[in-house]
Amino acid sequence: MSVRYKFRNQEKLYFISFSIVYWIDLFIRNEYKDILIESLRFCQKEKGLDIYAWCIMTSHVHMIIGTRKDKMENIMRDYKSHTSRTLKKAIKDNPIESRKEWMLWLMERAGKKNSNNAKFQLWKQDNHPIEL
């Protein structure tokens, strides 16, 4: 990650933006968006995440966040890790997902190309945090 884009001050608000690998339009289905929202609620309740604004687009997410408890980089790491595993399972288990094989193939390809991952990558690595 660039030195320019980091969570430097935990007491400040940040605009963050993070996207699916290859800009896959994953969030055209409500069940996938619901996974993101449930996970955000968990982070609010258990990790002290404050969400001031959020927008789920078809291939990425924008948020304005702060924290009262855990460090923002740790919250986002855990959030993206959890949602990656949960979304992967939801895609695999969705009997009407016509794009299943294509999406999973691209995500596996991204994971193999990135030394930070073993075999699978759903989210791009960065959050592009900008202090407000």
Cite the ranges covered by each PLM segment:
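Short catalytic/metal-binding and nucleic-acid-binding patches
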Residues: 1-132
